[in-house]
């Protein structure tokens, strides 16, 4: 929005030329999203407390979590509002990639909102029925996948970039739709599974978004994309503003979500953020790098799959409790130790993911 206004005013005020620079808008994006989150946080927390919208804690969970019962939840509304407002302000709204991410962010946010509403307002601990949750997640992902395929059919936008290999970029064809579906839905649910401790999900989300900001910038720059042997996608550079909005909003939320948390993001936040990360990975053609940079999310998801599979096949559990962060809690690790160590792992994995751009 601002970029359109700047274009109109440039002939009269040279200052507005600054808004042409992606780096300048990226900085403003971080600061705007951060400021909005910090401003909305206390007000939203107070409102949630008045409405008695508090976290539901299952009795079979770790005993240390019982004290979290009643902590305000659905704080993801604040994150989504900060991200959306920031994107509308600082991004180039004629860019289709921006709207693709916004569509998934708000669509998955709506699914998460209904799920949270049923849990905390209707007092239904199961929330939205699983089949309906997956139906709407799938519907949104497929609509976006078909739209992106139609837009970039048989171009670099539908190639698969394989890390560590310079010239291995097969054209996916219709398999692009299948891959896009699984990346968006899978990442959304992986972040949702990770969101079990104070700040555990939001910091890796911030780190991965920051990593994708770098990748989006390189992918959208003709010189750097050629130098790094990755597809040149001119629309991708605008995703830098989207990624930095996620970083700013996430850091602002972490201010209130750090241990001991004053508010939880709920499914409205985790499903939406995961879906947005998956969409960004698809748009910059780095789905496999997402597996590396989002390794904490992958680890949490695999722990659940292995736990369920082992119990059904052998009648035995691999972990004391899944997702795996609960396993370490039950081993006696204090919650802050689990959280910070997972953050460190995430930071290392993001750096490894960025290194794949050069190591080919």
From Swiss-Prot:
Top-rank EC class of the record's enzyme: transferase
Subcellular location: Cell inner membrane
Catalytic activities: UDP-N-acetyl-alpha-D-muramoyl-L-alanyl-gamma-D-glutamyl-meso-2,6-diaminopimeloyl-D-alanyl-D-alanine + di-trans,octa-cis-undecaprenyl phosphate = di-trans,octa-cis-undecaprenyl diphospho-N-acetyl-alpha-D-muramoyl-L-alanyl-D-glutamyl-meso-2,6-diaminopimeloyl-D-alanyl-D-alanine + UMP
GO MF terms held by the record: metal ion binding; phospho-N-acetylmuramoyl-pentapeptide-transferase activity; UDP-N-acetylmuramoyl-L-alanyl-D-glutamyl-meso-2,6-diaminopimelyl-D-alanyl-D-alanine:undecaprenyl-phosphate transferase activity
Function: Catalyzes the initial step of the lipid cycle reactions in the biosynthesis of the cell wall peptidoglycan: transfers peptidoglycan precursor phospho-MurNAc-pentapeptide from UDP-MurNAc-pentapeptide onto the lipid carrier undecaprenyl phosphate, yielding undecaprenyl-pyrophosphoryl-MurNAc-pentapeptide, known as lipid I.
Membrane topology designation: Multi-pass membrane protein
A Gene Ontology term for the protein's cellular component: plasma membrane
Keyword rRNA-binding in record: no
Species per Swiss-Prot/TrEMBL record: Vibrio vulnificus (strain YJ016)
Protein name: Phospho-N-acetylmuramoyl-pentapeptide-transferase
Keywords from the UniProt entry: Cell cycle, Cell division, Cell inner membrane, Cell membrane, Cell shape, Cell wall biogenesis/degradation, Magnesium, Membrane, Metal-binding, Peptidoglycan synthesis, Transferase, Transmembrane, Transmembrane helix
EC number(s) reported in the record: 2.7.8.13
Pfam families, A to Z: Glycos_transf_4, MraY_sig1
Cofactor section: Mg(2+)
Bilayer-crossing regions: 21-41, 73-93, 94-114, 132-152, 168-188, 199-219, 236-256, 263-283, 288-308, 338-358
Similarity section: Belongs to the glycosyltransferase 4 family. MraY subfamily.
Origin superkingdom: Bacteria
GO biological process, one term: cell wall organization
Pathways per UniProt: Cell wall biogenesis; peptidoglycan biosynthesis
């Amino acid at each position: 929005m601002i970029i359109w206004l700047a274009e109109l005013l440039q002939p009269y005020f040279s200052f507005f030329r600054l808004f042409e620079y992606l780096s300048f808008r990226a900085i403003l994006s971080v600061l705007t999203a951060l400021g909005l989150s910090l401003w909305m946080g206390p007000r939203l927390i107070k409102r949630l407390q008045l409405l008695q919208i508090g976290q539901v804690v299952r009795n079979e969970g770790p005993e240390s979590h019982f004290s979290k019962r009643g902590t305000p939840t659905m704080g993801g509304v604040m994150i989504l509002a900060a991200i959306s407002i920031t994107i509308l302000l600082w991004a180039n709204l004629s860019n289709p990639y921006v709207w693709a991410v916004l569509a998934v962010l708000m669509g998955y946010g709506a699914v998460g909102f209904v799920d949270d509403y049923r849990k905390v307002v209707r007092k239904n601990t199961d929330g939205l029925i699983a089949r309906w949750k997956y139906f709407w997640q799938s519907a949104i992902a497929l609509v976006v996948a078909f739209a992106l395929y139609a837009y970039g059919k048989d171009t670099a936008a539908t190639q698969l970039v394989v890390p560590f290999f310079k010239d291995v970029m097969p054209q996916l064809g219709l398999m692009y739709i299948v891959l896009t579906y699984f990346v968006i839905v899978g990442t959304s649910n992986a972040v949702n599974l990770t969101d079990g401790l104070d700040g555990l999900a939001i910091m890796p989300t911030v780190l991965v978004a920051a990593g994708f900001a770098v990748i989006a910038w390189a992918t959208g720059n003709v010189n750097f994309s050629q130098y790094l042997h990755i597809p040149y996608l001119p629309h991708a550079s605008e995703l830098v503003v989207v990624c930095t909005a996620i970083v700013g909003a996430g850091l602002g939320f972490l201010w209130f979500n750090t241990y001991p948390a004053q508010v939880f993001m709920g499914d409205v936040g985790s499903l939406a953020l995961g879906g947005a990360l998956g969409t960004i990975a698809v748009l910059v053609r780095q789905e496999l790098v997402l597996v590396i940079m989002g390794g904490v999310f992958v680890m949490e998801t695999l722990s659940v799959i292995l736990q369920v599979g082992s119990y059904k096949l052998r009648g035995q559990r691999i972990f004391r409790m899944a997702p795996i962060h609960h396993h370490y809690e039950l081993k006696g690790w204090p919650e802050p130790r689990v959280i910070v160590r997972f953050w460190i792992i995430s930071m290392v994995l993001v750096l490894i993911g960025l290194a794949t751009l050069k190591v080919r």
